[in-house]
């Protein structure tokens, strides 16, 4: 693609840009941060061309800045995403994504027999890596699930 035919997504003055989200994951990230209910302008790019990923998703959220805790939750969905905080059209901070040790009240336990489905308790998982794969262990039923299984729900 040359510069004349390349489409660009409009820059934002202030807010957060989440780039390099794997294709088909952008909508999940949007819901994770409840951005779909925001009164702020949200720009969504789905299945955009990417030399590194083939296709990628992109989110730009005006006047909203995600914090380190939110970035660690994002790492479960998109471990290689980049998060840039923008002020006056300039990148002022890049957040490093690191897996959290624990994640609570974000995901539903895939085990249909888990107590979290029938009792008013928040889900709670311990997050760890095993042979390069991210796994989550439910605090209540103690079952271990791959990241993909837990985040697809």
Swiss-Prot record:
InterPro entries: Asp_carbamoyltransf_reg_N, Asp_carbamoylTrfase_reg, Asp_carbamoyltrfase_reg_C, Asp_carbatrfase_reg_C_sf, Asp_carbatrfase_reg_N_sf. One of its GO terms (biological process) is 'de novo' pyrimidine nucleobase biosynthetic process. One of its GO terms (cellular component) is aspartate carbamoyltransferase complex. Keywords: Metal-binding, Pyrimidine biosynthesis, Zinc. Zn(2+) binds at residues 109, 114, 138, 141. One of its GO terms (molecular function) is metal ion binding. It comes from the Bacteria. Binds 1 zinc ion per subunit. Its cofactor is Zn(2+). Contains catalytic and regulatory chains. Involved in allosteric regulation of aspartate carbamoyltransferase. This is Aspartate carbamoyltransferase regulatory chain.
């Amino acid at each position: 693609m040359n510069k004349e035919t390349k489409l660009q997504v409009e820059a934002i003055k202030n807010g957060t840009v989440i780039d390099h989200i794997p294709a088909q994951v952008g909508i999940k990230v949007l819901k994770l941060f409840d951005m779909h209910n925001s009164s702020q302008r949200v720009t969504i790019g789905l299945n955009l061309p990417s030399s590194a990923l083939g296709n990628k998703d992109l989110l730009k959220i005006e006047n909203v800045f995600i914090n380190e805790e939110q970035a660690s939750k994002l790492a479960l969905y998109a471990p290689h995403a980049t998060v840039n905080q923008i002020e006056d059209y300039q990148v002022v901070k890049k957040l490093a994504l690191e897996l959290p040790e624990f994640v609570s009240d974000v995901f539903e336990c895939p085990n249909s027999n888990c107590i979290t489905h029938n009792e008013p308790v928040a889900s709670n998982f311990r997050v760890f890596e095993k042979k390069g794969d991210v796994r989550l262990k439910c605090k209540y039923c103690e079952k271990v699930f791959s990241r993909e299984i837990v985040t697809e729900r």
